């Protein structure tokens, strides 16, 4: 593509409600408007040679508040406000290391966070202190599910799907507050939920399509 993304590695693609295509890259995020790309580098600091040190973005998702939530490869989460074209830090109302955030997904206005301690539900509030704008995460102190959770996805209604210990594919009913085992495999690498089908990617093995409607 002429005038494409400048030498970046693309990890994830997100189609926003604004009609733009948003890309998570090894240097931050990029926006494609149908004609050209615009890069928004996420800089974590400057090295001894005054070279910017970028944060790689693993996953990008638009929230119900219109902000874009970015999962970082080094662990953690940050937000991007497309209107002011600025990254916003995320803070928590309870003790939690930002780097402990391993995955996330939105469901019915709640932000579900995967941490090293398990799966947590949270609510998001945008705050301003002086000249500093940030996003405050109000965390439920009790985990929804304990254990080594990963690869979180949601149907946007009452169901969450994720892996536990990289082997078990699990369904969680948000209404009944119960978990059920879908299937256990040797190694679960990724999960994707599309149109009632759960796609289960396994390491060095076939991809499984699981029909959730049956």
Tell me the role of every PLM-derived stretch.
Residues 1-214:
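Carboxylate-rich, polar loop motifs that coordinate divalent cations or form catalytic acidic clusters
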């Amino acid at each position: 593509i002429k005038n494409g993304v400048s030498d970046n590695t693309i990890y994830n693609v997100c189609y926003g409600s604004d009609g733009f295509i948003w890309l998570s890259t090894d240097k931050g995020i990029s926006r494609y408007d149908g004609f050209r790309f615009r890069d928004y580098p996420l800089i974590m600091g400057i090295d001894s040679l005054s070279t910017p040190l970028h944060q790689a973005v693993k996953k990008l998702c638009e929230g119900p508040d219109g902000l874009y939530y970015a999962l970082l490869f080094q662990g953690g989460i940050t937000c991007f406000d497309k209107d002011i074209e600025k990254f916003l830090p995320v803070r928590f109302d309870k003790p939690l290391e930002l780097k402990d955030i391993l995955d996330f997904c939105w469901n019915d206005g709640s932000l579900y966070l995967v941490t090293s301690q398990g799966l947590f539900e949270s609510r998001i509030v945008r705050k301003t202190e002086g000249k500093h704008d940030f996003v405050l995460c109000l965390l439920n102190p009790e985990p929804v599910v304990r254990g080594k959770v990963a690869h979180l996805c949601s149907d946007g209604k009452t169901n969450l799907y994720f892996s536990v210990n990289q082997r078990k594919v699990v369904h969680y009913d948000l209404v009944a507050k119960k978990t059920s085992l879908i299937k256990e495999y040797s190694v679960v690498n990724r999960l994707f939920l599309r149109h009632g089908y759960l796609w289960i990617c396994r390491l060095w093995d076939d991809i499984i399509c699981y029909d959730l409607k049956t």
